Curated annotation (Swiss-Prot):
Pfam families, alphabetized: MMR_HSR1
High-level lineage: Bacteria, Pseudomonadati, Pseudomonadota, Gammaproteobacteria, Alteromonadales
Residues binding Mg(2+): 46, 68
CDD domains per the UniProt record, alphabetical: YihA_EngB (cd01876)
Residues the record lists as binding GTP: 39-46, 66-70, 84-87, 151-154, 184-186
Native organism: Shewanella denitrificans (strain OS217 / ATCC BAA-1090 / DSM 15013)
GO CC term (a single one): cytosol
Cofactor(s) in the UniProt record: Mg(2+)
Keyword line: Cell cycle, Cell division, GTP-binding, Magnesium, Metal-binding, Nucleotide-binding, Septation
Name of the featured protein: Probable GTP-binding protein EngB
EngB-type G domain: residues covered: 31-205
NCBIfam families, A to Z: GTPase_YsxC
Family from the record: Belongs to the TRAFAC class TrmE-Era-EngA-EngB-Septin-like GTPase superfamily. EngB GTPase family.
Gene Ontology MF terms in the entry: GTP binding; metal ion binding
General function of this protein: Necessary for normal cell division and for the maintenance of normal septation.
Length: 219
């Protein structure tokens, strides 16, 4: 079966949940495909989601980092979902709340079998903080591919941007093919075709294609 092209503009809000337990209550089960978006609270995660789906308010943006406290789920179709995980690591968020978020993030990465890929968003000017590395390590340990997305790339000159991209790729080289690194700008659209190509690949894992082929009637 040939791989089709996913139209990410079709994304629509499905549900919000405070943690993975509540997520399991409302979703149709740990089935289909999910792609998670994770990042520090000032990494531009909501803006990236809105840019990739060409919807100005799919994910709510705020000038106050740490505003997104829930797991927000968006449906692409009956089988595929985008999951906006709580922002992590913002200093002004109370410690108890930060710990709650960290627990939810860890539970999701370790328990969600339908997770097909994780986008870890990092401000290109401040990449690979401790929590970013922890997210990447968690995902790879669970054999989940990662896209390390260096956001706000328009903030740097071309030479500085590529220097940072190459440095991050070098720092993550030990993870091999499990981790890809790409620059991205929600404002300028830089990197959008490449990111959508990776997400589309994650939306069509071989096991899902095989299952759909078995369900299709023979010609």
């Amino acid at each position: 079966m040939s791989e089709s092209i996913m139209d990410f503009r079709r994304a629509k809000f499905l549900i919000s949940a405070p943690d993975i337990a509540h997520l399991n209550q409302y979703l149709p089960g740990d089935v289909g495909v999910e792609i998670a978006f994770a990042g520090r609270s000032n990494a531009g995660k909501s803006s990236a989601l809105n840019a990739l789906t060409e919807q100005k308010s799919l994910a709510r943006t705020s000038k106050t980092p740490g505003r997104t406290q829930l797991i927000n789920v968006f449906a692409l179709d009956d089988d595929r979902r985008l999951v906006d995980l709580p922002g992590y690591g913002f200093a002004q968020v109370p410690l108890a709340l930060k710990n709650k978020w960290q627990q939810a993030l860890g539970e999701y990465l370790q328990k969600r079998a339908c997770l097909s890929g994780v986008v870890v968003l990092m401000d290109i000017r401040h990449p690979l903080k401790d929590l970013d590395m922890q997210m990447i390590e968690w995902a790879v340990a669970s054999e989940i591919p990662v896209l390390a997305l260096l956001t706000k790339s328009d903030k740097l000159a071309q030479s500085a941007k590529m220097k940072t991209v190459n440095e991050v790729r070098s720092a993550l080289a030990d993870f091999g093919d499990w981790v890809k690194v790409e620059p991205f700008s929600s404002l300028k659209g830089t990197g959008k075709p490449k990111v959508l190509s990776i997400l589309n690949e994650w939306c069509h894992p071989q096991w899902l294609m095989d299952a759909m082929a078995q369900e299709s009637p023979e010609d």
